[in-house]
Amino acid sequence: MGIEYRSLHTSQLTLSEKEALYDLLIEGFEGDFSHDDFAHTLGGMHVMAFDQQKLVGHVAIIQRHMALDNTPISVGYVEAMVVEQSYRRQGIGRQLMLQTNKIIASCYQLGLLSASDDGQKLYHSVGWQIWKGKLFELKQGSYIRSIEEEGGVMGWKADGEVDFTASLYCDFRGGDQW
């Protein structure tokens, strides 16, 4: 039997599914996954990959409100993309992202994510591009430049019609802003 993919809203996840998700994220990120990171994972849509009843892959799409230069936009922000170690390099991550693209296309003006160096190749393969514009984050009521994040944030739009050199301003949240 193959891998089964399910799309669910956080409100539809059972306690045991949330616990399995947390365990997968801690393992997949080798312990470098904070409580803030987990909070960022909740409150939106999840695409989950199962091998029978075992959760082996996950990605979340969370609604965020940002600005593209001076224009407010609704963003589907990708969080907590992970595939269990023994299931990697089998196309599961690609399938998770293809389904993510469909959700973003139907619900948001733009898709964004903060990619690890290892993840960029996968995201490029499903149409995501490095954001070339300046990045800003809200800190104590003022926007400051997120220089350390530049080159790691990627964007995707179904029709491709977005200026990837425009400045992006992200909303405020606990933990990492991007």
UniProtKB/Swiss-Prot annotation:
EC number(s) from the headed UniProt entry: 2.3.1.59
Keywords: Acyltransferase, Antibiotic resistance, Transferase
Reaction catalyzed: gentamicin C1a + acetyl-CoA = N(2')-acetylgentamicin C1a + CoA + H(+)
Top-level division of the source organism's lineage: Bacteria
Residues the record lists as binding substrate: D32, E79, A80, S114, E148, E149
Molecular function terms, GO-annotated: aminoglycoside 2'-N-acetyltransferase activity
Gene Ontology biological process terms, A to Z: response to antibiotic
SUPFAM superfamilies listed in its UniProt record: Acyl-CoA N-acyltransferases (Nat) (SSF55729)
A Pfam family this chain is assigned to: Acetyltransf_9
Domain N-acetyltransferase: 8-171
Acyltransferase found in the keyword field: yes
Coiled-coil region(s): none
Binding, CoA: M81, V82, V83, R88, R89, Q90, G91, I92, G93
Stated role: Catalyzes the coenzyme A-dependent acetylation of the 2' hydroxyl or amino group of a broad spectrum of aminoglycosides. It confers resistance to aminoglycosides.
Subunit structure: Homodimer.
Family (UniProt): Belongs to the AAC(2')-I acetyltransferase family.
Protein name: Aminoglycoside 2'-N-acetyltransferase
Name of the coding gene: aac
